[in-house]
UniProtKB/Swiss-Prot annotation:
<keyword id="KW-0863">Zinc-finger</keyword>
<protein>
    <recommendedName>
        <fullName>Differentially expressed in FDCP 8 homolog</fullName>
    </recommendedName>
</protein>
<dbReference type="InterPro" id="IPR002219">
    <property type="entry name" value="PE/DAG-bd"/>
</dbReference>
<keyword id="KW-0862">Zinc</keyword>
<dbReference type="InterPro" id="IPR025258">
    <property type="entry name" value="RH_dom"/>
</dbReference>
<dbReference type="InterPro" id="IPR046349">
    <property type="entry name" value="C1-like_sf"/>
</dbReference>
<dbReference type="Pfam" id="PF13901">
    <property type="entry name" value="RH_dom"/>
</dbReference>
<feature type="zinc finger region" description="Phorbol-ester/DAG-type 2">
    <location>
        <begin position="400"/>
        <end position="453"/>
    </location>
</feature>
<keyword id="KW-0677">Repeat</keyword>
<feature type="compositionally biased region" description="Gly residues">
    <location>
        <begin position="38"/>
        <end position="51"/>
    </location>
</feature>
<feature type="compositionally biased region" description="Acidic residues">
    <location>
        <begin position="473"/>
        <end position="492"/>
    </location>
</feature>
<dbReference type="InterPro" id="IPR051366">
    <property type="entry name" value="DEF8"/>
</dbReference>
<dbReference type="InterPro" id="IPR047983">
    <property type="entry name" value="DEF8_C1"/>
</dbReference>
<feature type="zinc finger region" description="Phorbol-ester/DAG-type 1">
    <location>
        <begin position="161"/>
        <end position="214"/>
    </location>
</feature>
<dbReference type="Pfam" id="PF00130">
    <property type="entry name" value="C1_1"/>
</dbReference>
<comment type="similarity">
    <text>Belongs to the DEF8 family.</text>
</comment>
<feature type="region of interest" description="Disordered">
    <location>
        <begin position="468"/>
        <end position="492"/>
    </location>
</feature>
Length: 492
C-alpha cells in the first residue's frame, strides 16, 4: 500500500519539460540538451498508458516532485498528465478536460484546488510551447537558456545578480541563500533560478526537489491575509511533521526542532523556518500591534505579496481603532477629502490632460477612490506618519488645481443659509455636506437650523404639493365617471 501511495505522490505537477524538449526537436538540436523540470518522469503518456517507473529527465536523472494527485482523480490522470512527447493538440485536449473537471468538482475541495493549479500549469505550458515554435530561428542553446521552469506553481527564470557594475558590488556585499537547501549560492560558480512571482531563490540543482507551493498561488487562492492571530493547531495535529516538507520534528534535537510561525500557526523545521521577523496582519487589525514576530519562509513571501494590495476593510473589521488611534482618524479625514476632490478632477478636462491624479497617486489610486480599503503598507505608514504626509501633499496639489481651474470652480457651492458669496467645497474645513441632496453649507449655519437642510424641506414640500394635485385630479376623474342621485332623478 505504501508503494502505491508513493507512486501517486511522485506524479509531477508541471509541464515545463515538454516545452524545452519539444522546442529542441523543432530546432533539430542534439538530444543532450534539455536539463529541464517537467511533467515527465513517472507519468502517463497521452495515449492512455498507466503510470510506470520514473523516467530520467535532465543530466542527474532526478525525480520531479509536485503536489500529490488526489485519489479521486487517479483514473483521470492519463488524460491530464503528459510526458515530453505531448504536442499542442494534447495540451489543448487536456486543458478542456481539466476545465470540465473543475466545473464538476465541489467548491473548496482538494480536488478542485489541485485541478485549478494543474489547469494553470497546462495553460502556461501551452503558451510556452506555442512561443517556442515561433522562435524556430533562435539557436537551441538560446531556447534552453531562456526557458522558464514551472514547478508547483513557481515560474523559475535564470537569476543574474552580476549584471552591471553596481549590481556586482551589491551582490558581493550580500549573500544569497537557497530557499530549498538553505546553503549559500555562489553566483560566480553556481547557476541559480528565481521565481518571477514570489521571489523564491534556488540552486539550479535544487529545482528538482522543490516542494513549497508558490506563495503567489496561495495568495490568489486565499485572497485575504489570515485574520486570526496565530491560529495554532499543535504539533499533534500535524503528526509531529513539518507543515511544508514533512520532516519529522524533535524537540530534543536543534537541527530538527519545531519552529512556530506566528502568521499561520503551523510548525516548521529549521530549513523551512529561518526565524525571519515580520509584522503580522492579524495583530495589526485587531491590536494595532506592529511588533515583528517570527514567521516561516512561505509566510514571509505571502505577507510581502499582500503588502501593497488594498484588501483590508479596517473600519468593518475593527471600527473602534478609529476612536483610539488619532493618526488613523486623521488619515480617514484626509482620504474623505480626496474622495470629494476626485469627483471634481474626474469631470475636469484640464486635470485629465495633465494626468493630475496619476501624477500624484501613481499606483495608489485606491487612496482617493474610497476610504474603506487599506493595504498593509498603508497601515504601516499610518503608524510611522508617512502616509499622513503623503496625503497632505496630494491634498495640496488637488486643492491648488481646483481653486484655480475655471471648470472646477463652476461646480462650487454657495451657502444658501447665510447668502455669502464665498464659494465652498465639500472638502473645506468648516463645511458640511447633506447626505440627502448633496448640498454644501457652512457647519455653523446648518447648526443654527438644527441640522435641518432647507433644500430638503423645499423638495419635501414640493413632493407633497404634487401628491395633493395628483389626488385632486384623481377625484375629479372619479366624479366625471360616476352618476349622482340627482342625475338619476333627472333622467327618470
Amino acid at each position: 500500500m505504501s508503494s502505491w501511495k508513493d507512486s501517486l505522490t511522485s506524479i509531477p505537477g508541471t509541464v515545463a519539460q515538454l516545452i524545452n524538449e519539444s522546442a529542441s526537436n523543432l530546432l533539430h538540436a542534439s538530444s543532450t540538451l534539455g536539463s529541464t523540470v517537467g511533467l515527465g518522469g513517472s507519468g502517463s503518456t497521452g495515449s492512455g498508458s498507466e503510470a510506470g517507473g520514473s523516467e530520467e529527465s535532465g543530466p542527474q536523472g532526478a525525480e520531479y516532485r509536485a503536489l500529490p494527485i488526489p485519489a479521486s482523480l487517479v483514473r483521470e490522470q492519463w488524460r491530464l498528465i503528459f510526458t515530453s512527447d505531448a504536442n499542442i493538440q494534447d495540451l489543448q485536449a487536456a486543458i478542456a478536460h481539466c476545465r470540465d473537471l473543475v466545473l464538476l468538482s465541489e467548491e473548496l475541495s482538494e480536488e478542485r484546488r489541485w485541478l485549478v493549479r494543474h489547469l494553470v500549469d497546462l495553460r502556461y505550458s501551452l503558451q510556452e510551447l506555442e512561443e517556442a515554435q515561433e522562435q524556430h530561428s533562435l539557436s537551441s542553446d538560446m531556447v534552453v537558456m531562456n526557458a522558464i521552469r514551472a514547478v508547483v506553481g513557481h515560474h523559475f527564470v535564470p537569476h543574474h545578480p552580476h549584471h552591471g557594475k553596481r549590481n556586482r558590488l551589491q551582490a558581493a556585499a550580500k549573500r544569497n541563500y537557497c530557499d530549498h537547501c538553505t546553503t549559500i549560492i555562489w553566483s560566480v560558480v553556481q547557476n541559480s533560478y528565481v521565481c518571477s512571482d514570489c521571489g523564491f531563490l534556488v540552486h539550479q540543482k535544487c529545482i528538482d526537489g522543490v516542494k513549497r507551493v508558490c506563495a503567489h498561488v496561495l495568495v490568489s487562492e486565499r485572497q485575504h491575509p489570515i485574520s486570526e492571530i496565530c491560529p495554532e493547531i499543535g504539533l499533534a495535529s500535524q503528526g509531529y511533521k513539518c507543515a511544508e516538507c514533512g520532516t519529522m520534528l524533535n524537540i530534543k534535537n536543534t537541527w530538527i526542532e519545531p519552529r512556530l510561525c506566528d502568521y499561520s500557526g503551523l510548525y516548521y523545521c529549521p530549513r523551512c523556518n529561518w526565524n525571519d521577523s515580520n509584522f503580522i496582519p492579524a495583530r495589526i487589525i485587531h491590536n494595532w500591534d506592529f511588533s515583528p514576530r517570527r514567521v516561516s519562509r512561505t509566510a514571509l513571501q505571502e505577507i510581502r505579496l499582500f503588502l501593497n494590495k488594498p484588501l483590508i476593510r479596517l473600519e468593518e473589521d475593527n471600527p473602534k481603532l478609529f476612536v483610539f488611534v488619532e493618526k488613523l482618524c486623521a488619515v480617514k479625514k484626509l482620504r474623505q477629502n480626496l474622495v470629494h476632490m476626485r469627483h471634481y478632477l474626474a469631470a475636469c478636462k484640464i486635470a485629465s490632460e495633465l494626468k493630475l491624479v496619476d501624477q500624484q497617486l501613481g499606483v495608489r489610486r485606491h487612496l482617493a477612490q474610497s476610504n474603506e480599503f487599506y493595504s498593509l503598507s498603508d497601515l504601516s505608514q499610518v503608524e510611522s506618519g508617512a502616509l499622513s504626509e503623503f496625503l497632505q501633499g496630494v491634498f495640496k496639489a488637488f486643492n491648488d488645481h481646483i481653486r484655480s481651474c475655471p471648470m472646477c470652480l463652476a461646480q462650487a457651492y454657495i451657502c444658501e443659509i447665510c447668502s455669502n458669496n464665498e464659494v465652498i467645497f465639500p472638502f473645506d474645513d468648516g463645511c458640511i455636506k447633506c447626505d440627502q441632496c448633496n448640498s454644501i453649507f457652512h457647519r455653523v449655519c446648518l447648526t443654527r437650523k438644527n441640522m435641518i437642510c432647507p433644500k430638503c424641506i423645499r423638495i419635501q414640500e414640493r413632493r407633497l404639493q404634487l401628491d395633493r394635485m395628483k389626488s385632486t385630479e384623481d377625484d375629479d376623474d372619479d366624479d366625471d365617471g360616476v352618476a349622482t342621485d340627482d342625475d338619476v332623478t333627472a333622467a327618470e
